[in-house]
């Protein structure tokens, strides 16, 4: 999504070229051009490749686009189609962790045709049963642990098939400013939309907000009601309810909640987007059209969103009403992660006049956003790698290097090269060069220190030790 008054920062948009097509209604309402990679035609969704989407599913997409109120009462046959299940299976990560049943991708594939046919038949006659997800944890930047759920392999397959079918409907409904976990969209496009929106519109105040524990507090009752606006096939709705009620298995104990959707399965991001489409997106769109007098910019990525306002009083009014809106659906803004700050083209000048120093910054999708100037002295939004992200990545890298310290130097060098390339691909945006160089240098230093502290026998050659990272 791009502001029509400015040019896209194309260097941070993924390499995939944009689709050709007409604007969808949501983005016309945004007053911006069509997003690169958005889906105006019904030739996809891209959770799977275009060639894997049969004409029957394209007809579902076309019907959804023609009538925004149509409820689809016959969808399950798209889900239990053996070919679609096979494509879903092959799209899974081969080395992904197994669920509570221990079934792996490779073992399941030894009798793939027979297993998929059996799965299809169970789905068809209503005998399919969802299993609890296995609890796993990954570290967060603040040192805490983020809980995830690992579904069993067959649940992964069926969820992916359901997501493909439902995307054919919901991708015609979702609004242009929603970017998180959608086919053909990416964090870089959200960053692009935000930067161009702040630069091209009369933005003077920025609301940086986060919904507290969204994935844990999402209300199942409301979610089912929202789904039933479009999905009239009770068999598909029951499938979703089975996953919601399957529970979590941790230390041999199964727990079930009437709230939340476990992060880890492919269905959770779609359910989150459906929930926020009705709770947040449609409401924000209506508020902006009917109550805002100045410019308003909005970009949402899952439960994290940033909004730009021309007038402070409108931003404060919106924030008050947003809290009330979310409370009606069991949600609340995170008090420590929600801020209204002066940010925009005139922020530095205004704050200097009041003796308040430089404008505050805000973080979004791994970048710290800063009011800056171009080489010609014009206003621009600078984006630097978040310090916490930078430090957390280096800390993880040190742990991994210690684990690999006895491996041959070329093998470790190849690993570090992949780390640096991956970092550059995400954080390599204009005017972030110094942070990129600093990261590369820090990676090299970490490797050099660990090798210098290791016994000579642990390295095949010590002549190449030094402070520079490989590649």
Located regions from the model:
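Non-catalytic terminal/accessory segments
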Residues: 1-471
